[in-house]
């Protein structure tokens, strides 16, 4: 099979994998090396549906011994199959990088011949890139559950970020749709990677040139919409993953119908839950940067997010006792809870109010989004002049602000091969 045919098949087979961000790394270039994650390395470029397109996102092979119902590459799927040799993949990546098509590599693979054999092939491809071609750019590799821990260790020494897909939000759903996989087999490498990263950081603190293990951390991805779990269940799982496994990111992938399996939504009537995916990402942001907890955002009475407003606004509307916040006296944590105030603008407020009392005009200059924040804060004990605040009125105004986004059509995945313009 021609190399271009392999690339066409294996790039298309990888398009449903969302966990390909490249932030959080500072691997510097060397005179004898190629690429860098500083000046010329991992510039972020995202397609309309939020997926990173700055990396060559490809599978080593789409031949698989597993038969997961939700996966386009499952054993029983009638699709064209292909596989790169490690040398082919390394040469392809270097060629694309030299032509400035990509800033790095995102490498995953179906499991062919067992987890160990698949991981060994991935390791060889990355070894060629790092050692033979001197590639210093960003590499994100998918660790294969069930592989020998020593192989996972070797993979992490060659890659900048590792990830292990948790696949589905519950053990019950995993057993129904992916009977060849087990929760314990997925969580074991996540724990190993966590421990390896912590050990590596300790070694680097003592020895400057100690080998770095997955220096950009680890992430995971789960499919939403294929199974009946609520947003509360998903967000509680996310919180636990961040707390226990120290993940950098949890990615959410709206289920795309690829199968007529009886346990999955019927493709004819199913619409991918892209808005739900968006709300989960917004809530995830609140967990990571705004010091919210999953149990604060959703509860038994409200197990799913309101699709009409973002999670932060929804929380604010459900907790009127917290508001209004007086911007000239509130601490940092209270400011973060105000819709329209972000991490940067909250810090600016703390600095600016040392010099003089803040006004609404001043807040706008500091980057506060007043069209949302005005309903939840006061300056000098007063709301914005002329503003009338009532729960129903605030909700209507917030929904009106979201309406342009709610009316957008479903985004499409960009293609490497189709002609544009």
Question: PLM features: what roles do these ranges have?
Answer:
Residues 65-67, 83, 96-106:
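Short, flexible active-site-proximal loops enriched in glycine and acidic residues
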Residues 1-63, 369, 377-378, 382-408, ...:
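Flexible, acidic/Gly-rich N-terminal and inter-domain linker regions that tether
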Residues 352-353:
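Residue-level signature of tetratricopeptide-repeat
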Residues 58-87:
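Canonical Radical SAM [4Fe-4S] cluster-binding loop centered on the CxxxCxxC motif
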Residues 263-336, 372-421:
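Long, highly charged, low-complexity intrinsically disordered interaction regions
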Residues 55, 68, 107, 164, ...:
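Conserved, mostly hydrophobic/aromatic
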Residues 90, 95, 113-297:
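Conserved AdoMet/S-adenosylmethionine-binding subsite of the radical SAM
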């Amino acid at each position: 099979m021609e190399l271009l045919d392999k690339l066409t098949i294996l790039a298309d087979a990888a398009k449903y994998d969302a966990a390909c961000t490249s932030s959080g790394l500072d691997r510097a270039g060397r005179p004898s090396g190629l690429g860098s994650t500083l000046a010329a390395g991992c510039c972020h470029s995202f397609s309309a549906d939020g997926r990173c397109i700055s990396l060559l996102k490809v599978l080593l092979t789409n031949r698989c011994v597993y038969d997961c119902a939700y996966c386009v590459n499952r054993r029983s799927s009638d699709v064209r199959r292909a596989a790169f040799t490690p040398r082919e993949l390394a040469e392809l990546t270097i060629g694309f990088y030299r032509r400035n098509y990509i800033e790095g590599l995102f490498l995953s693979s179906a499991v062919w011949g067992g987890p160990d054999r698949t991981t060994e092939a991935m390791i060889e491809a990355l070894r060629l890139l790092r050692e033979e071609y001197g590639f210093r750019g960003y590499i994100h590799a998918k660790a294969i559950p069930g592989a020998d821990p020593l192989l996972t260790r070797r993979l992490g020494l060659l890659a900048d970020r590792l990830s292990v897909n948790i696949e589905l939000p519950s053990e019950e759903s995993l057993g129904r749709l992916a009977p060849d996989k087990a929760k314990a087999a997925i969580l074991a490498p996540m724990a190993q990677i966590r421990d390896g990263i912590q050990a590596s950081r300790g070694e680097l603190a003592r020895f400057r040139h100690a080998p770095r293990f997955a220096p950009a951390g680890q992430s995971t991805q789960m499919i939403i919409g294929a199974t009946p779990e609520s947003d509360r269940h998903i967000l509680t799982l996310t919180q636990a993953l961040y707390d226990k496994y120290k993940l950098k990111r949890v990615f959410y992938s709206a289920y795309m119908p690829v199968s007529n399996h009886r346990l999955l939504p019927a493709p004819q009537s199913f619409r991918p839950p892209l808005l739900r995916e968006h709300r989960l990402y917004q809530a995830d942001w609140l967990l990571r940067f705004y010091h919210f907890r999953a149990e604060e955002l959703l509860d038994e009475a409200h197990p799913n997010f309101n699709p009409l407003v973002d999670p932060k606004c929804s929380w604010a509307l459900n907790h009127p006792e917290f508001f209004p916040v007086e911007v000239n006296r509130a601490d940092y944590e209270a400011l973060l809870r105000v819709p329209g105030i972000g991490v940067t603008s909250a810090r600016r407020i703390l600095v600016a109010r040392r010099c003089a009392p803040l006004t609404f005009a001043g807040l706008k200059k500091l980057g506060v989004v007043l069209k949302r924040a005005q309903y939840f804060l006061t300056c000098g004990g007063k709301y914005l002049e002329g503003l009338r605040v009532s729960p129903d009125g605030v909700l209507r105004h917030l929904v009106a602000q979201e309406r342009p986004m709610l009316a957008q059509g479903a985004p499409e995945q960009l293609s490497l091969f189709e002609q544009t313009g």
